[in-house]
C-alpha cells in the first residue's frame, strides 16, 4: 500500500477490538457488516471524530472555548488523514425557513437571475412594465400630447382617508396653486380641508401648459420637480379627455401608472423584509384556530367540557358570561354544543359585539350588576401568545392548525415579487417545479432573453444547471426547490448534501457517507454510484457505510466488520476488492455468493378476508387514488423515490387511524372516505428514531423489564429485612444509587481548553449503586451484575420468572441477544433501536387486530439483519395482525403477501397506483419499475 494511505492502529471505540486497518486513499471504499458490528464506530466515531478533533486543534484556545472541543477517540494512532467531511442521514435542520433551494444555494442564484434578467408585468393590466429616463419621458409626452393642454402632476396621496388641511397649508406656502383631488382639478383656498372619513387621491399640479417642442426645457424642469414630489412617479393630466397618464423612473405600468422599484436579489427572498410576505413573514403558512380541536365532541355540553379550552363548569365569571350569552342566543350550558345555532356558536368562539349585563349575585359572585364584553374563546386562547412559558405555548398550539398563508398562497413572497417573470413564470412557480422539470426548463432558457440579458445571465444559469444536474444524478429530481428541509427524510437530506459537495469541486478531501442508498429505488442506484465515483475521480477519498450489493460491486475496496454484532463483533473479518471478499469466511460473503439467501416464500398468507380501503386520496402528488389494504397480511408499499408512498401511508392512512383510535390532532391529507377501520383496534408505528436521548436510557428501561427486575430484587429476603423498596434499585433516583456520580458510574472532570474527561467513580467503582444496595443479591448476582449481563445471559438467568423472561426473550428473538441490559441507548444504531421497539411490541399481548406501520425498516441493516427482521414481522402477521412496510429492499418486497406499487415516476409524474397484488403479479406489470427488478429474481 502507498505511504499516504489512512493507517489506523489500535482502534477501541465502543466495541472495536483493538483494530488495525489500512484504507487506500483516492478510492471508493465500502465498510459493511452486521448492524451493531462496529461499522459506524470505525467510520464516524474513529476516523471522522479524529479528523474533526485535529481541525479543532488548529483553532486558538480562545476560539475553542466558544466552539467546544472534541473528545479524542480511543485509538493509538491514525496517519494519512486528510480533511474529513461527514455526510450523515440525520435531518438536523428544523428551521422552517430552510428549503431545498436554500440548502443547495440554487435559490441564491435564482434570485440573482430574476433580479438581473426578468421582466415585470402590471398586476392590473398584465402588460409589460416599462423603465424610462426623464429625457425619454419628455419625448413621449411631446409625441403623445403635442398641441394639447396638460397639467404636469405628482401623486402625493393615493387612496387614504384624512382631511389634509395641514398638507394644503404647507403646499400653499410653497407656492403651489392647484391639485387634482378625487378626479377634479381644484384651486387651493385658505383653510381648505376634505371629508376625513372618505378615501381620497390627490395629485399636486406642478405646471400647466400647451405641449409644444418650444417648451421642451420647461417640461423637463417641471417633470423633474414632479418626480421629486411624487418620489419617482409623475402623471400627465389631459384637459381634453380628462384622463391621467402615469410615468415613473422605476418600472411602471404605462396604462395605470402602477410602479415597482427596480428588483434586487432581496426582492425575491422570503428571508428578507423586502421580499417576504408581510402576513406570514415569509413562512408560507399561518396558524389558525381549528374548530374540530376546540369542539372535539359535539355531544358534550358546555357544562361537561364541550369547549375544550374552557374545560368543565366552574363557578366563575367565565361561565357566568357564557350563561348570559346563552340567554341572548337561546342555548343553555346543558345543551350539547352540536345543537347550538351557528350564530350562537360564532358568538361563543369569536365574541359578541354587544356588551352583556351580568348580575353577579345571581351567580353567587360578589358584586352587583356588571357590564362586560365577551371577546370569544379564540381571543381567550390567543392571550397566551405573549406568555413566555413553554407550557402556555404548548397549551395554545394544541388548538391550532397550520394552513397555507391566506395572503401569499404559500409562496412566502410579497405580491410585487410575483409580477417579475422569465418565460411567463415567476420565481415561486419555478421554485414549485420538480427539479427534473426545472432542469428541462432552464436548459432552454436563453430563448427568453434579449442579447443583453443573455450575456448578464450566462454565468448565473451555468451555476444553476450544474447544481441541478447533481441533484438529478443522486435521484432527487422529484423534489422541488420550495420543499421544506424539515419534511425531508434522512436519506434525502444526505443526498442533497452529497450533491452540494460534488458541486463544491473540493479535492483531496475524505468524504464519509452513511448508507446513501437509503430511500432510493433500485432503479436510481446506478446514478448514485456514478455520483460517488465522480466525487472520487475529482481527487477525493470516499468511505461509504453501506449494505447494498450494487454499491459493494462498484467499490474499489471493501472492509467487512464482524463477524457478529456487539461484543462478538468489532473485528476486521475481511478487507480487499470485491473478489477478495467473496473468498472470505464471513456472513457477508455467504450472502454475496449465494451460500446464504433469503428464500422466496413457498406460499403467501391468505389474510383474514377483510380490508382497509381509502378512497379519493389526493394529498401532495397522489392522483385521487383508491387503495385497498388487505388485512392479516404483510403489505409492502413500493415505488421510486417521491412517488407518493409516504404521502399515502404516513400522511394519509396513519393520521386517519390515529384520529379514530386515539383522538389524535394529526390532520390527514385530503381524501374522500375510509372503510374497514372497525377491523383495527390498535395502531403501532415503528421507526428508527433513537429510543432514548439520555445515556441513562437502556434496553432494560425501554422494554420496561427493569421495573420487573427491581420488583424481583425488592422481594428478596435481604431487601425485605432492610426494608428496601423497588425504587431503591433505580440508578435514577436518590436512595440506592451512588450520590457521588448520581448513578452514572463515572464522574466528569471539566477541562477548560480540552475535552471533558470521564473517570470511573471512586466511591462506587463504576457500579452506580451504594454499598448497601449492592449487598442485596438474587441467585448470587446484585443489581449491577444484572445490568452488565448480555440479553442472552439474562434469558437463562431469569428463565423461571415469566414476566421478565418473556420481555428478554422478545429482545433475543429480534437478534439483539448480544446487547447488555445496561447499555446506553445513545450508543445503539438505528437498526438496533428499531428492533428494540419491535421487541417491545412482540412482548405485549395483542388482539390480532393491530396494524403496524414501518417506514424503510431495512435502513442500516445487513442481509442477515434483514432475515431476522423478516422473521419478527412474520410472527406479528401470523398472530393475525397486519404489517404495512414502505420499502425499496427487494429481499423484503419479494416475501410480502401483497404489494402496492405507486408511480410510475416521482413527483408530479407519480401518485398513481401502478400495480397491486402478489410479488409475482406485480412482476408481470410492464409499467412497474419494481416489477422489472422482481422479474430478475425469478418471480
Task: Label every PLM stretch briefly.
Residues 1-939:
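Conserved phosphate-binding elements of NTP-dependent enzyme cores
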Amino acid at each position: 500500500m502507498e505511504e499516504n494511505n489512512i493507517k489506523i492502529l489500535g482502534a477501541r471505540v465502543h466495541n472495536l477490538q483493538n483494530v488495525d486497518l489500512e484504507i487506500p486513499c483516492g478510492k471508493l471504499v465500502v465498510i459493511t457488516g452486521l448492524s451493531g458490528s462496529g461499522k459506524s464506530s470505525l467510520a464516524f466515531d474513529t476516523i471522522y471524530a479524529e479528523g474533526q478533533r485535529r481541525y479543532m486543534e488548529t483553532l486558538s484556545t480562545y476560539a475553542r472555548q466558544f466552539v467546544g472541543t472534541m473528545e479524542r477517540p480511543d485509538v493509538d494512532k491514525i496517519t494519512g488523514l486528510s480533511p474529513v467531511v461527514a455526510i450523515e442521514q440525520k435531518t438536523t435542520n428544523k428551521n422552517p425557513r430552510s428549503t431545498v433551494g436554500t440548502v443547495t444555494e440554487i435559490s441564491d442564484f435564482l434570485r440573482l437571475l430574476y433580479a438581473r434578467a426578468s421582466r415585470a408585468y402590471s398586476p392590473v393590466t398584465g402588460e409589460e412594465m416599462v423603465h424610462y429616463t426623464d429625457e425619454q419621458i419628455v419625448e413621449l409626452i411631446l409625441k403623445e400630447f403635442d398641441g394639447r393642454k396638460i397639467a404636469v402632476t405628482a401623486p402625493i396621496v393615493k387612496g387614504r382617508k384624512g382631511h389634509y388641511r395641514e398638507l394644503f397649508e404647507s403646499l400653499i406656502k410653497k407656492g403651489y396653486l392647484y391639485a387634482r383631488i378625487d378626479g377634479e382639478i381644484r384651486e387651493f383656498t385658505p383653510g381648505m380641508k376634505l371629508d376625513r372619513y372618505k378615501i381620497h387621491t390627490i395629485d399636486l399640479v406642478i405646471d400647466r401648459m400647451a405641449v409644444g417642442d418650444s417648451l421642451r426645457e420647461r417640461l423637463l424642469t417641471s417633470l423633474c420637480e414632479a418626480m421629486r414630489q411624487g418620489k419617482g412617479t409623475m402623471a400627465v393630466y389631459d384637459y381634453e379627455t380628462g384622463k391621467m397618464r402615469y410615468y415613473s423612473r422605476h418600472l411602471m405600468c404605462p396604462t395605470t401608472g402602477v410602479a415597482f422599484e427596480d428588483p434586487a436579489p432581496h426582492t425575491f427572498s422570503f428571508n428578507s423584509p423586502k421580499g417576504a410576505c408581510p402576513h406570514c413573514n415569509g413562512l408560507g403558512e399561518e396558524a389558525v384556530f381549528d374548530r374540530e380541536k376546540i369542539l372535539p365532541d359535539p355531544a358534550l355540553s358546555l357544562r361537561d367540557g364541550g369547549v375544550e379550552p374552557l374545560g368543565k363548569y366552574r363557578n366563575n365569571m367565565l361561565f357566568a358570561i357564557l350563561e348570559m350569552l346563552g340567554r341572548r342566543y337561546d342555548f343553555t350550558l346543558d345543551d350539547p354544543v352540536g345543537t347550538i345555532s351557528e350564530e350562537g356558536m360564532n358568538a361563543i368562539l369569536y365574541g359578541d359585539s354587544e356588551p352583556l349585563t351580568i348580575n353577579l349575585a345571581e351567580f353567587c359572585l360578589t358584586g352587583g350588576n356588571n357590564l362586560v364584553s365577551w371577546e370569544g374563546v379564540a381571543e381567550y386562547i390567543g392571550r397566551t401568545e405573549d406568555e413566555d412559558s413553554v407550557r402556555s405555548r404548548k397549551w395554545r398550539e394544541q388548538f391550532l392548525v397550520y394552513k397555507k398563508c391566506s395572503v401569499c398562497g404559500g409562496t412566502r413572497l410579497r405580491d410585487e415579487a410575483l409580477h417579475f417573470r422569465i418565460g411567463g413564470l415567476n420565481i415561486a412557480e419555478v421554485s414549485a417545479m420538480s427539479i427534473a422539470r426545472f432542469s428541462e426548463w432552464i436548459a432552454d432558457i436563453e430563448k427568453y432573453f434579449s442579447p443583453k440579458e443573455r450575456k448578464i445571465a450566462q454565468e448565473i444559469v451555468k451555476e444553476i444547471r450544474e447544481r441541478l444536474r447533481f441533484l438529478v444524478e443522486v435521484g432527487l429530481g422529484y423534489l422541488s426547490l420550495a420543499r421544506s428541509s424539515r419534511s425531508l427524510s434522512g436519506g434525502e437530506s444526505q443526498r442533497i448534501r452529497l450533491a452540494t459537495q460534488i458541486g463544491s469541486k473540493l479535492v483531496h478531501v475524505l468524504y464519509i457517507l452513511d448508507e446513501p442508498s437509503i430511500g432510493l429505488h433500485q432503479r436510481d442506484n446506478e446514478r448514485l454510484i456514478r455520483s460517488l465515483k465522480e466525487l472520487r475521480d475529482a481527487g477525493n477519498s470516499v468511505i461509504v457505510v453501506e449494505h447494498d450489493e450494487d454499491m459493494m460491486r462498484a467499490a474499489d475496496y471493501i472492509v467487512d466488520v464482524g463477524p457478529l454484532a456487539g461484543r462478538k463483533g468489532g473485528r476486521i473479518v475481511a478487507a480487499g476488492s470485491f473478489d477478495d471478499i467473496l473468498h472470505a469466511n464471513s456472513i457477508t460473503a455467504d450472502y454475496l455468493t449465494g451460500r446464504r439467501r433469503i428464500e422466496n416464500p413457498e406460499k403467501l398468507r391468505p389474510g383474514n378476508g377483510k380490508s382497509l380501503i381509502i378512497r379519493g386520496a389526493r394529498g401532495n402528488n397522489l392522483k385521487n387514488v383508491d387503495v385497498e389494504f388487505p388485512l392479516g397480511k404483510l403489505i409492502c408499499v413500493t415505488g421510486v423515490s417521491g412517488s407518493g408512498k409516504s404521502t399515502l401511508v404516513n400522511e394519509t392512512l396513519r393520521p386517519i387511524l390515529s384520529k379514530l383510535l386515539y383522538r389524535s390532532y394529526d390532520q390527514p391529507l385530503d381524501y374522500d372516505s375510509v372503510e374497514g377501520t372497525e377491523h383495527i383496534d390498535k395502531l403501532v408505528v415503528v421507526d428508527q428514531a433513537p429510543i432514548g436521548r439520555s445515556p441513562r436510557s437502556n434496553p432494560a428501561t425501554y422494554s420496561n423489564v427493569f421495573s420487573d427486575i427491581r420488583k424481583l430484587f425488592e422481594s428478596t429476603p435481604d431487601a425485605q429485612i432492610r426494608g428496601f423498596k423497588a425504587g431503591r434499585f433505580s440508578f435514577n433516583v436518590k436512595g440506592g444509587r451512588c450520590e457521588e456520580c448520581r448513578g452514572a458510574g463515572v464522574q466528569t472532570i471539566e477541562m477548560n481548553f480540552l475535552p471533558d474527561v470521564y473517570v470511573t467513580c471512586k466511591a462506587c467503582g463504576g457500579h452506580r449503586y451504594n454499598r448497601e444496595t449492592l449487598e442485596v443479591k438474587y441467585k448470587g448476582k446484585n443489581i449491577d451484575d444484572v445490568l452488565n449481563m448480555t440479553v442472552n445471559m439474562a434469558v437463562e438467568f431469569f428463565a423461571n420468572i415469566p414476566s421478565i423472561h418473556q420481555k428478554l426473550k422478545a429482545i433475543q428473538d429480534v437478534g439483539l441477544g448480544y446487547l447488555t441490559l445496561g447499555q446506553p441507548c445513545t450508543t445503539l444504531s438505528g437498526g438496533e433501536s428499531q428492533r428494540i421497539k419491535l421487541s417491545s411490541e412482540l412482548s405485549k399481548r395483542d388482539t390480532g387486530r393491530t396494524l403496524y406501520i414501518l417506514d424503510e425498516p431495512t435502513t442500516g441493516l445487513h442481509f442477515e439483519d434483514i432475515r431476522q427482521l423478516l422473521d419478527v414481522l412474520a410472527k406479528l402477521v401470523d398472530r393475525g395482525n397486519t404489517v404495512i412496510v414502505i420499502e425499496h429492499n427487494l429481499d423484503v418486497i419479494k416475501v410480502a403477501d401483497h404489494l402496492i406499487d405507486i408511480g410510475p415516476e416521482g413527483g408530479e409524474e407519480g401518485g398513481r397506483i401502478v400495480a397491486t397484488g402478489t410479488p409475482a403479479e406485480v412482476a408481470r406489470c410492464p409499467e412497474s419499475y419494481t416489477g422489472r427488478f422482481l422479474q430478475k429474481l425469478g418471480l
